[in-house]
Structure formats: C-alpha cells, structure tokens
Swiss-Prot record:
The protein's name in its UniProt record: Proline--tRNA ligase
Keywords: Aminoacyl-tRNA synthetase, ATP-binding, Cytoplasm, Ligase, Nucleotide-binding, Protein biosynthesis
PANTHER family (alphabetical): MITOCHONDRIAL RIBOSOME PROTEIN L39/PROLYL-TRNA LIGASE FAMILY MEMBER, PROLINE--TRNA LIGASE
InterPro entries: aa-tRNA-synt_IIb (IPR002314), aa-tRNA-synth_II (IPR006195), aa-tRNA-synth_II/BPL/LPL (IPR045864), Anticodon-bd (IPR004154), Anticodon-bd_dom_sf (IPR036621), Pro-tRNA-ligase_IIa (IPR002316), Pro-tRNA-synth_IIa_bac-type (IPR004500), Pro-tRNA-Synthase_IIa_type1 (IPR023717)
Self-association state and partner proteins as the record states: Homodimer.
Annotated organism of origin: Helicobacter pylori (strain ATCC 700392 / 26695)
Location in the cell: Cytoplasm
Major localisation: cytoplasm
Domain remarks: Consists of three domains: the N-terminal catalytic domain, the editing domain and the C-terminal anticodon-binding domain.
Transcription keyword on record: no
Family: Belongs to the class-II aminoacyl-tRNA synthetase family. ProS type 1 subfamily.
A single GO BP: prolyl-tRNA aminoacylation
C-alpha cells in the first residue's frame, strides 16, 4: 500500500471530548469517525485491525467446534415478550414499529433469536450438542455513551450459543469455550484475567468475565495475592472476619444518641468498633408495575454492594428490575428516620429486609431504635424470627481470600468477554425442546458466550499504547512495516524505497510505503500516531552505507540493519514481538 493512496484522515488534535487514550488515538490517527452519540464509522485502518481480530476469533472458535452463522440484527419484539425480557431489559433496548405497526427491537443480545432457531430445527438428542456463533453489529441504547468504543451504543460483537441435552454436556462446552477465549486473547497479545462475575440481564446460573488489566478500566476486579481466586467486585466473596476484641457487651436497652447518624459516630459514641454497629441502607425497589422499599443491614465498617443486593432480593421472589437510593421523601412516607433505622418493628415500614450473612447469629450489636436520636444496644439477632441473610457487602482490600486466606487486592480492568451457563430459562419461556433417548420431551440446556470485537480495539490500546499514539500487538497492527523516506525528492532514495518495498512484499510482509512529499518529521509523527510495528528509514546515509535504521514502535528502540540482511532481520523482528 502507498501512503498517498491510503484513506487515513489524521487530525492535528484529538477530539475535545475524548478522555481515554484509546479514544484519542483512534480518532486522531484516522481509525474511526464519530457520526452520533456512541456511534462510529470504522475507516480503513480500523477495518484492517477488526479483520485481524475477527480472523483470530473465527479460527479459534472453529477449532473448538463452533459453527459460524449470521442472524438478523432486527428481531420481533414478541420473542422478547415471551422470554420476559422486553420489560426487564429497560430503556437500553431500542424498540420500534414498522409501517404495518409491528413491534421490533434492535438486538443488544440474541438469546431469543437463537432459541427460536433451535426450537424449529433441533428435534432430537442425536443433533446435540450444537454451538453456533456469529460476528455482527449490535445496538444498546446506552444512557451515557462514553470513552469511544469502550461504551458505544452501536458495536460489533462475537456472540455464540450452545444447546445441550443435559447440564454435564453444558459444563464441558462452558470449559471448552473458556479455553477458546483464552487462546483468542493470548493470540491478541493481551494481559488478561478470567474472573467470576454476575450474569446481569442475560441471566443464568454461572458466568465468567474475561477482563483486560488497565488503569483506565471501567470495572474493578478483586484478585487474591496468594492463589488464583479472582472475581468482579460485584460478586466477590471473602473469608469470615475475626471479631474485634472490645465487644460492647450490654443488656438490651435504648440510649439517647443525639446527632449520631453515621456508623462511625455511633461507634465513637459507645467507644467501640463500627464492626458492632448495624448500618441500615434503604433502597427504592423498582418492579415492572410498582415501587417498594427494601432495607439492607450490614456491619458499620462494610458497604453495600448494589448488584449483590438486587440479586438477593430476586432470590426471595421480589422480581426487582433495579435499586435506587431512597429519598428523604420516601423515608418520610413510611415513617423512617435516616441514621436511626433498626430491625425492631421494621417490617411495617418496608417490604423487604435482608441482613448480610456476616451478621448471622450476631449479638452485642448496636442498632437504630427507629426513633430520632435513639439507638438500641445489646441487640441479639438470634432473638428475631425468619430473618433473611445473604452476601450483600462489597469486598474490601483489607479482606481475606475465601479460598486460601490470602490478601485481596483491587485491580482496574476492562471487560472484553463473558461466558454464561444459561440453563433452561430461555428454552422454557420460548418452548424450545427436543426428544431425549427415551423419546421424552426435554428443554435444552443452553450456554451463551460473547466477545466485544470492536471494544477490543480500545482494550489493546489502553493496555499497550503510549502518549504518542497507537501501539498494537503482533497480530493486530494494521501494517507490519512503514518505509519512511527522508527526502522524497531525491530520486535515488525514492528508487531504493520502491525496491525495498517490493522485496518486503515478496516475503509476505504487509508494508506501507510513505510516498508523500512531506517533511520527514511529519512522516515520523504519523508513524508514532498510527502504530505500524516497524519503521524502516531510508535517507542519504542509507545510500552511502547500505544500512537501514529500523525503529520498533512498541518501545521506539532503534536498530541498524545491513542491506544484505534486510528481509531476514525484518522477519525476525516481526516474529519476535
């Protein structure tokens, strides 16, 4: 490719609204062009990188037995009604009508679509297992699209679905796909982790995320420093903590506690640790057709994990869609006073009460007395009947690993893949069944597997690039080598550049010849910005010495290469990175 023919509209400055370096570099280097909020055009350089990512993905998925298909981007809303997700998914699901007044959705995920395919064409256990996948455009109407391709509304996704006759078969495919994903991300040259995760709106019994470690990541993962335990902070667990020594032993009594509304101030008032204070957190619960209130109790030195809290509610049948902060008006309406909420008589004020599992059989506790400026001491939870306990706290870095007692540490990360065990939920709601070996009708066990193809462009750059521009990995750079001529008006330099260009092409090197009549500094700036893996410099000294200067984009390290060794050395350098 000649640079003069390459459509790469570079910018002098990155967009003003770009925050992450990946967004800045992709826009400034002419990879992407924004056409609307969270919607981007992929220009030739980006398309080359996308193609490489997709080719690696196709290769590994098919090696692991998956078959490539292409499903409709537009899906009947009636399918989403059958699965129950039309209302549950929320406003991120874009619903529209055609000219005949039929309702459709632009797919953010395709569980309904693929399940309908299976229901129509897989009739016998003899056809199982089946794993089908696609790479296609998706749309999620994000309320706040940001960070370029990291949180876009329109994006490219590899999503796959598997169908099985039993849970054992699903377990095998879950691990098989996990292996495929590990190979894909390793081929892409990424430093990543596999972590336990929440299943979210997709549902299912078990899920794992594949996250790329980067300080600019949206997510926080909790990693053990001693073993391989790793989990998204939304579901991370910890070992039971040892109880502090100064236990505030007391008979049940009510004490005046003026202006002590925080767990810390209550602990200081009673000269004890926040560990022994019951912290009450009231949330407004949003259901499909109503709103209720829930109260969650944790120890005073813990914080509520909202995802865990929502899941705990749904386990007890709340059918909650989301949680929101309860306003002062919400509390006033039910007669609760912030800072003084406790378990005594609370059932008449809220619809749901859940205690963190660390409080099970807890005694010697201090809690709000449900009366302004009063707290109760000597609270013993064993005296209450039918309390609901669940893991609802957010793990802290001071906590210990649930597997080995090792220290837990936070890491910022960016999710690039997610695999789920869906079970029979979608199959039952969409009546997708088959006949087993005994001729009995059974519902499919399903798996779901996704990789954010377009998001991977940002993930690679967030982990690998520098302040100058794009740094790609071995298998993702748009070009292997750019040939930069110091003085394009020098016919001898120009002639040598074309000769070298042809020599590299013959060796299978994806080379870009910068044939522009531009300043040498400007050409090198574009090399740093675009991120070809190597820059081969041709100047007056090259003609005299028969030696080339070669620069690695990854670290800007320079190396001198003799003309007679050119192809051999270039291939070695490309293979080594």
């Amino acid at each position: 490719m000649l640079f003069s023919k390459l459509f790469a509209p570079t910018l002098k400055e990155p967009p003003k609204d770009a925050v992450l370096k990946s967004h800045k570099h992709l826009a400034q280097a002419g990879y992407i062009y924004q056409v609307g909020s969270g919607i981007y055009n992929f220009l030739p350089l980006a398309k080359k990188v996308l193609d490489k990512i997709e080719n690696i993905t196709h290769k590994r998925m098919q090696e692991h037995g998956a078959q490539n298909i292409l499903m409709s981007f537009v899906v009947l809303a009636s399918l989403w009604e059958k699965s129950g997700r039309l209302d549950k998914y929320g406003k991120e699901l874009l619903v529209f009508k055609d000219r005949k007044d039929n309702d459709f959705v632009l797919s953010p995920t395709l569980e309904e679509n693929i399940t309908e395919i299976a229901a129509n064409f897989i009739k016998s256990y003899k056809q199982l297992p089946v794993h089908l996948y696609q790479i296609h455009t998706k749309f999620r109407d994000e309320i706040r699209p940001r960070f370029g391709l990291v949180r876009a509304r329109e994006f490219i996704m590899k999503d796959g679905y598997s169908f099985h006759e039993d849970a054992e078969s699903l377990d095998k495919e879950f691990l098989n796909t996990q292996s495929a994903y590990k190979e894909i991300l390793s081929d892409l040259g990424l430093d990543f982790r596999i972590v336990e995760a929440d299943s979210g709106a997709i549902g299912g019994s078990k899920s794992r995320e594949f996250v790329v470690l980067t300080e600019c990541g949206e997510d926080t993962i909790v990693v053990c420093q001693n073993c391989d335990y790793a989990a998204n902070i939304e579901i991370a667990k910890r070992s039971k903590r040892p109880e502090p020594l100064n236990v505030p032993k007391a008979q049940l009594a009510k004490f005046p506690t003026p202006n002590t509304t925080s767990a810390q101030s209550v602990a200081e008032f009673f000269k004890t640790e926040p560990y022994f204070v019951l912290k009450a957190l009231v949330r407004k619960v949003i259901h499909k057709d109503k709103e209720t209130l829930a109260c969650f109790f944790v120890r005073g030195d813990d914080n509520l994990e909202e995802v865990k809290a929502l899941n705990a509610l749904n386990i007890i049948g709340a059918n909650a869609l989301e949680l929101r902060e309860a306003s002062q008006k919400d509390l006033d309406n039910v007669g609760l006073i912030a800072g003084f909420i406790g378990p005594y008589g609370l059932k008449k004020h809220v619809s749901y009460i859940i205690f963190d599992e660390d409080l099970k059989e807890g005694d010697c506790l201090i809690a709000g007395a449900n009366e302004k400026d009063f707290h109760a001491v000597g609270v013993d939870l064993k005296g209450f009947e039918n309390l609901v306990y669940a893991d609802i706290v957010q793990v802290k870095e001071s906590d210990r690993c649930p597997n080995c007692q090792g220290a837990l540490k936070y890491h910022k990360s960016l999710e690039v893949g997610h695999i789920f065990k869906l079970g029979q939920g979608y199959a039952k709601s969409l009546k997708a069944s088959f006949l087993d070996k005994n001729g009995k009708e059974q519902f499919f066990e399903m798996g779901c597997y996704g990789i954010g193809i377009s998001r991977l462009l940002s993930a690679i750059l967030e982990q690998k690039s520098d302040d100058l521009g794009c740094v790609w990995t071995k298998n993702t750079a748009p070009f292997d080598v750019v040939i930069v001529v110091s003085n394009w008006k020098d016919e001898a330099q120009k002639k040598l550049a074309f000769e070298v260009y042809e020599r590299l092409l013959q060796k299978g090197v994806d080379a870009l010849l910068d044939d522009r009549d531009a300043r040498f500094g400007a050409k090198m700036r574009d090399f740093e910005l675009i991120g070809e893996r190597l820059a081969l410099i041709i100047g007056k000294q090259t003609l005299e010495s028969k030696e080339f200067e070669c620069i690695k984009r990854a670290n800007l390290e320079k190396q001198t290469i003799k003309d007679i060794e050119l192809e051999e050395k270039i291939l070695e350098m490309l293979e080594s990175e």
